[in-house]
Amino acid sequence: MHTVFRSVLLLTLSLLTFGCAQNFYNVPRDVYEKQVRTLGVAPIFVDGDSDIRHPEKEALVNLVRENNRKNEKELVAQLRETGTYFAVRLLEDDADQLFPTLLSRREKRDDAGVKYNKYFFKPEELKSLLAKNGVDAIMLVTVNGLTRPEKIYSSNLLSYLESDYNYLAVSAQIVDAQGNTLWEYPNFRQHSLSYPMLFALQYPDFDEAKANESNNVEVRFKTIPGIARAFAKMEATQGKGQVSVLYDNIFSDMASLQQPERNLFGGRKDEGKEQKGAGQK
């Protein structure tokens, strides 16, 4: 009996002491949290030169640009709510001017089975931008086009089409003044890799194939009005505003990968240390 009680006690103490130890940063968690107290968030970019295959590409890019402006403040709000940072600021720079100024190159990558676009930015321009805004690091978020193979099922789940589909994806990095990438999205430090897309630009037209008694299912692009309606679907935020459901899915995923380490009771793991230190002063 004493042995069982002791084992349970040791397990409980271990959970209280270590919590969930997973680190999603490219540096040790404690180093990141000490280094990045004030985070700047650049206005969300759209990379019109990426793999966006929609026949009305210009209209689509303009639509994304408009929705970036409408929703980017919610990303800042969600990052603030993590409690990881002392302050999170949305930079006031113009996204269309800032992106080409900062961009060094883009690479199509396939890492650990995840296809994505990785962005590289000019160190000197980044250093200047951070100094101008008085932030410790900056988060750079880019909406881009990406084509990847998928198996998509019909609404009745009886048929599927495995093909290459064009998507709107989101890539992001948190970079310091020395140009070091401290955190990135997609994030390869997850136990189970996941990389949700912002929006599927194409769909398999099962209904047309059925209507024409055909086994040939065409892959079609969604219309601009249809895409606009999808982006316009809103949900309430924790504040008084609203955010597009599409963006909220991505923002929530990003914010979850920047949560501070928690103890068993849901508090920050370092809260006890901070309170103890304050009491000794």
Language-model region placement:
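N-terminal post-signal-peptidase region of extra-cytosolic proteins
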Residues: 25, 119-126, 153-159
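Generic short beta-strand segments
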Residues: 44-47, 142-148
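N-terminal segment of the mature soluble domain
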Residues: 54-145, 175-195, 200
